[in-house]
Amino acid sequence: NIAKDESKFEITYNAVKDSGFQFYSYDRGECEKYGLKFNTIMYDRTLTLQTAHEQYDTLFLGYLKDRKEDILSLYDMFTSAGLTPRFVIVSNGERKEKFPFEYRDDYVGYYDYLKMVGTSRAILDIAQQKQDGYSMRVMEAIFFNKKLVTTNTAVKQSVFYDENNIFI
């Protein structure tokens, strides 16, 4: 997401733009703003989930970034509704705070994350501010036949949108 560090992107872009490189983004807004080429996010269809007991209603794994208030609000909403969410926040060097969910100091590998997905009925996708493109969470919900709860309203315009499987 360029919006989180626009100056770093501009430095990189200006340094290599005359070297024949092409820049792509899965976010249409970024493509329009910066003159990039659009391409959807890709996913490896050969990945599979291990069969597991679905013990959580929703799974969120990610950094806090600019989403702290949304994350806390959604966690409270899910637990108040009697759901069993699993939220795993990975440290990004920010000050540790007391959260009502899992907090990890170390990176969670993708295969470990997929094990978490296998134990959840739905995947929670909390878009970053100014993000229009679909995240990997959207693709994972589709490929692993999981429900999707997302804050990304652009999903409603997609060809795969199904109100029975996707909640915005």
What are these regions (language model features)?
Residues 24-32, 89-95, 151-156:
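Short, polar loop motifs at secondary-structure junctions
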Residues 36-39, 84-86, 148:
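Hydrophobic anchor at the start of a short beta-strand
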Residues 31-33, 72, 95-97, 132-139:
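Short, mixed-charge, low-aromatic patches
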Residues 8-12, 44-48, 108-111, 136, ...:
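A generic local structural motif
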Residues 99-105, 113-168:
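Catalytic binding pocket for nucleotide-activated donors in carbohydrate/polymer assembly enzymes
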Residues 69, 73-111, 153:
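Catalytic donor nucleotide-activated moiety binding site of glycosyltransferases and closely related
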Residues 1-79:
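Catalytic core of nucleotide-activated saccharide and alditol-phosphate transferases
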